[in-house]
């Protein structure tokens, strides 16, 4: 989403990322961006509702499923909807979309957004280091460190992000978890039990 926001900034279009910061898996990246002075890039979904109109475009990134969007209220209130995703299409897709960029052969949504960035604006407008590392982390996560679902385009996107300043060492730090998080996850896994058709009961 931060890559799409950078495209909006390059095009001088006001934009924000609607995200519940207390429930996102991208907390480390968001914290790094906030520390770099980009706190205004983010807004709570409920806080976004008053600024939405029929002229507002909602860009959904990395999912096509209605049940996985950050806020259905935002989706329903926006006048236009665009979807950027790489997952193979199944049930529950967003029917309201006015524009769909669906590329199942891409390794990740980050790869697609990185390709878009190479065709927008001048070199000086490109993502900063933290934004580039966020995109690279998306590629590394979805490809399991470039071992699955990679192609020429994947490595070209990664090379572009390296040119923008992304460092793999910094990217790996985004995946680091605290000891509290690690022990909590380990406890959840160890206490999980099989229940009715392989559903997990804790």
State the predicted function of each range.
Residues 5, 30, 71-75, 158-159:
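Short amphipathic alpha-helical segments and helix-helix/interface helices
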Residues 15-17, 81, 135:
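Hydrophobic/aromatic residues located in beta-strands of well-ordered beta-sheets
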Residues 38-99:
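Active-site cofactor/cluster-binding pocket
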Residues 202:
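Calmodulin-binding IQ motif helices
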Residues 1-13, 88-199:
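A structured phosphate/pyrophosphate-recognition subdomain
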Residues 1-52:
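Anionic-ligand anchoring segments at beta-strand to alpha-helix junctions in alpha/beta enzyme folds, i.e.
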């Amino acid at each position: 989403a931060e890559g799409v926001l950078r495209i909006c900034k390059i095009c001088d279009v006001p934009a924000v990322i609607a995200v519940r910061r207390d429930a996102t898996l991208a907390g480390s990246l968001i914290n790094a961006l906030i520390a770099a002075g980009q706190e205004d890039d983010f807004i709570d979904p409920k806080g976004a509702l008053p600024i939405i109109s029929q002229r507002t475009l909602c860009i959904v990134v990395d999912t096509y499923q209605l049940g996985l969007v950050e806020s259905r209220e935002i989706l329903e209130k926006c006048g236009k909807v665009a979807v950027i995703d790489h997952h193979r299409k199944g049930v529950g897709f967003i029917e309201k979309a006015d524009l769909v960029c669906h590329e199942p052969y891409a390794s990740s949504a980050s790869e697609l957004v990185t390709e878009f960035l190479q065709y927008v604006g001048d070199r000086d407008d490109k993502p900063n280091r933290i934004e580039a590392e966020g995109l690279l982390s998306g590629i590394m996560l979805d490809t399991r460190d470039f071992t699955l679902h990679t192609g020429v385009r994947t490595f070209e996107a990664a090379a572009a992000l390296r040119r923008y300043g992304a460092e793999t060492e910094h990217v790996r730090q985004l995946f680091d978890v605290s000891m509290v998080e690690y022990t909590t996850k380990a406890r959840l896994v160890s206490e999980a039990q099989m229940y009715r058709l392989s559903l997990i009961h804790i």
